[in-house]
UniProtKB/Swiss-Prot annotation:
GO CC terms: chloroplast; DNA-directed RNA polymerase complex; mitochondrion
GO biological process terms on file: DNA-templated transcription
Gene it is expressed from: rpoA
Self-association state and partner proteins as the record states: In plastids the minimal PEP RNA polymerase catalytic core is composed of four subunits: alpha, beta, beta', and beta''. When a (nuclear-encoded) sigma factor is associated with the core the holoenzyme is formed, which can initiate transcription.
Protein name: DNA-directed RNA polymerase subunit alpha
Domain of life: Eukaryota
Length: 335
């Protein structure tokens, strides 16, 4: 019989967007679901995704403003309604979308009387403004306002260092997070050991990314963080490779009939290879060869597997051991 830790599911894990709306240019909302999950998995994924969405996605902000003849941040300028501090706070709120790496320069140069908005910022071609109507200042007199700006792409929240004002250059607190908020909730259904979960994920962004784009990027970042653990499997001691064990010829396809005969109740196409607890390197090799289920695996011969890129005879031996463990079949001693 199949051991209890292999849970046969007739459903494939699926996600979809169930709600999407734009409340304003700088506030987008998306609601997503992922199901069916086993008990406990929804909370694991929800917590990880929330952290990745809030902390791992990069954004672009104005991090410094420079203008001549301004003595300090709290001074006022004749002919401008706002104080320097208020102008800096308005610049902080400007939402940018870019493919920027590191920092770059931008500027504002206008003559009053008139209102100054985000549309007046002169940007490099690879940076764009999400909402051109965002207010910066009001010029009440026929004066010139020229401000040099520094743009930076980063992640998280950077607080300006105290006493970091020099030559009319003022640092600005930067909120690089395109995702403004994330909520996750869990709906459980079923009974006893068959209980399953649905994960609901709500995402609010500032408009520089859509919630769906943010979800993709956070997922990629999570995968990148875990890849070193997968590579560790490939860095095993070289001495292990010096003791190769020859295996008796065995064809998975030849065993398929016997497994089906003895295990009629096993839905082979619904047992996925990730349920077999294979090492990450073997698992990745199989997935890259479009082997996703136990049925896919058993439809390949030993020779087919060894021909796969980066696949070794030791890996085939380990698959033998895994199938023996889960199906209580001594594959190596059966021809």
């Amino acid at each position: 019989m199949v051991r209890e830790k292999i849970r046969v599911s007739t459903q494939t894990l699926q996600w979809k967007c169930v709600e999407s709306r734009t409340d304003s240019k700088c506030l987008h909302y998306g609601r997503f679901i992922l199901s069916p999950l086993m008990k406990g998995q929804a909370d694991t994924i929800g917590i990880a995704m929330r952290r990745a969405l809030l902390g791992e996605i990069e954004g672009t902000c104005i991090t410094r403003a420079k203008s001549e003849k301004i003595p300090h941040e709290y001074s006022t300028i004749l002919g401008i309604q706002e104080s320097v501090h208020e102008i800096l706070m308005n610049l902080k709120e400007i939402v940018l979308r870019s493919n920027l790496y590191g920092t770059c320069e931008a500027s504002i140069c206008v003559r009053g009387p008139r209102g100054v908005t985000a549309q007046d910022i002169i940007l490099p071609p690879y940076v764009e403004i999400v909402d051109n109507t965002q207010h910066i200042a009001s010029l009440t007199e026929p004066i010139d306002l020229c401000i040099g700006l520094q743009l930076e792409r980063n992640r998280g929240y950077h607080i300006k260092a105290p006493n970091n004002f020099q030559d009319g250059s003022f640092p600005i607190d930067a909120l690089f997070m395109p995702v403004r908020n994330v909520n996750h909730s869990i709906h459980s259904y079923g009974n006893g050991n068959e209980k399953q979960e649905i994960l609901f994920l709500e995402i609010w962004t500032n408009g520089s990314l859509t919630p769906k784009e943010a979800l993709y990027e956070a997922s990629r970042n999570l995968i990148d963080l875990l890849i070193p653990f997968l590579h560790a499997e490939e860095n095993v001691n070289l001495e292990d490779n010096q003791h190769k064990v020859s295996l008796p010829l065995f064809t998975f396809h030849n065993r398929l009939a016997e497994i089906r005969k003895n295990k009629k109740k096993i839905a082979l196409k619904f047992i996925f290879i990730d349920q077999l607890e294979l090492p990450p390197r073997i698992y990745n090799c199989l997935k890259k060869s479009n082997i996703h289920t136990l049925l896919d695996l058993l439809n390949n011969s030993q020779e087919d597997l060894i021909k796969m890129k980066h696949f070794r005879i030791e890996d085939v031996k380990q698959i033998f051991g895994t199938l023996e463990k889960h199906f209580v079949i001594d594959l190596k001693n059966k021809r």
